[in-house]
Amino acid sequence: MNQVYESWMKGGHQHVATCSDCHVPEGFVSKWLFKAENGLHHGYAVTFKQNPVSFQATDKGKNIIQNNCIACHSEYAAYSIDATMKKGAPGSEPLSCVSCHRQVGHAHNF
């Protein structure tokens, strides 16, 4: 986890956003359900020594990050992101904020 924190410190949002600002959903109920679920997963991983070596966002996590980008940057995102556009060959993922701004939150790809 230290590598993730260090890369955030080198990224573009270290002075304006915390981990939760990008990685936790907005809204009281959504936020606390998310924190409870992640706390259980983290507790299990630590207890049974199954900490991931690398971190990859799940589809749910990618959706949360996208929604939080749009929430903070709504004045730009409303005119910039067309989720129906594809970034590559047919069948590839739709474009998202991090399709182009991959290293904004972290200086390295996590």
Locate each region found by the language model.
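Short sequence/structural segments immediately N-terminal
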Residues: 1-110
